[in-house]
């Protein structure tokens, strides 16, 4: 399902290179593709999406991609271990720079985004003001990619 509603909540985090971010203010694109993941195995879904999203961003100026593994607050005390393990497993510096782990009260974080299903990944297209202008989820499909590209090509004001 591709719908558009919601606002990205304000949250502080770091990427896997250690750079601090205050989101959504620090999203760098005019439009930002946000990949929310909730379980380790969902990285396999992201890995299938990644080359398609990279190609899409390359075709559209001002589009940036961010991966946001989203974990409950209780994991914050082992944040260095989790982030270090993720960073060690990602060879690409670019991928580490765009991966920002979120440690938070997931219900409070996900509610404004309209995300209720953590059984798969969620894809969001977020503008500079933090507005969600498109939403999709799940395994890669050419139809979902086409819907995302259409939203990028003609964003709503």
Feature locations, PLM:
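N-terminal "domain-start" segment that seeds a small globular fold
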Residues: 1-24, 48, 96-98
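Short, solvent-exposed coil/turn elements at secondary-structure transition points
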Residues: 17-19, 71, 105-106
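Thiol-/selenol-based redox modules, centered on thioredoxin-like
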Residues: 111, 118-157
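Short active-site neighborhood of thiol/selenol oxidoreductases, capturing the structured segment around
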Residues: 26-46, 65
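Short, internal strand/loop/helix patches
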Residues: 66-68, 81-117
């Amino acid at each position: 399902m591709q719908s558009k509603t919601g606002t990205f909540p304000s949250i502080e985090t770091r990427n896997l290179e250690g750079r601090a971010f205050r989101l959504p203010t620090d999203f760098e694109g005019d439009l930002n593709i946000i990949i929310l993941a909730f379980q380790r195995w969902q990285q396999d879904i992201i890995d299938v999406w990644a080359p398609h999203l990279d190609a899409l961003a390359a075709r559209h100026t001002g589009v940036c991609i961010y991966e946001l593994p989203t974990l409950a607050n209780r994991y914050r005390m082992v944040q260095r271990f989790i982030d270090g393990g993720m960073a060690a497993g990602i060879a690409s510096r670019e991928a580490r720079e765009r991966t920002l782990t979120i440690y938070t009260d997931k219900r409070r974080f996900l509610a404004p985004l309209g995300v209720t299903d953590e059984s798969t990944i969620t894809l969001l297209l977020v503008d500079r003001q933090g507005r969600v202008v498109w939403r999709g989820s799940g395994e890669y499909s050419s139809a979902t990619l086409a819907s995302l590209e259409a939203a990028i090509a003609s964003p709503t004001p």
